[in-house]
Amino acid sequence: MSKNVKILVAAHKADPAIRQDEVYIPIHVGKALHPELDLGFQGDNTGDNISEKNASYCELTAMYWAWKNLKDVDIIGLAHYRRYLNISNDDILNFFRRSGIILPEKFHCRTDNYTNLVSLLTHEEAILAIDTLLKMHPDAKGSIQRYFYQSNRYSVFNMFIADWNTFNEYCSFLFPYLLKLEHRLSEPSYSRLKRNLGYVAEAMFGFWIEYAKVRTKYVPTVDLSPSPYGKGLKKRVRDLQRDLGFILAYLPIHQKPYYYGAALHGLRSQGIDVDNI
């Protein structure tokens, strides 16, 4: 049986590397912020959309647009204009004989996933990210402990390919969570980076896979720009070194999030409820 496969290619500018065919569909992310710019393809500012939030949500505005506006799609994905998953259309169809999701190969951190999240945000933002998750999903405490504090691997870029039902389940988890977190972050201005919610979503993808027990396949990423993560043997050696350091040196003394410190005190002193932490 044939399936309707659509993979959105998030782009904010014209580039000859942008893939465009019956499967790969370019989408202009943040179109609402730049109405004067016409890239000649679909914008994320039509129908039900959050295009104006692109500065903080990054490529997630394309994901939201697909969730709310695409119809009759069996398999949906998201790539970047210079980065996509290295998998053929035939292999995509073979995998989706059953439900599941395809993600980029995991990035190996030197620390646990929570500490890595702190390095991308502020400490206050990271605390609120975990506390908001616990408020909305109190049954997820075990998954949070395993994924954020006992693991050093996660998939980056917010790229994926999924059957529509799995995609709908993830979006139904992700966007209410991000909107709630965005509201909490806007009360005190803790954000130092506009792209904070995009970074949070990268971490949440892997958490949700752990929490929802989704069938998953990991594939390499094709990066048409110089990759900050390395390639080939050099990358494998680096990943092994980081894993050994994490298991032998970091994990034994960091299994509990003891290092909230002044950030947690500062949040509470401003009357912000973080009692789940």
What feature does the model see in each segment?
Residues 1-277:
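ER/Golgi luminal nucleotide-sugar-dependent glycosyltransferases, focusing on the catalytic module
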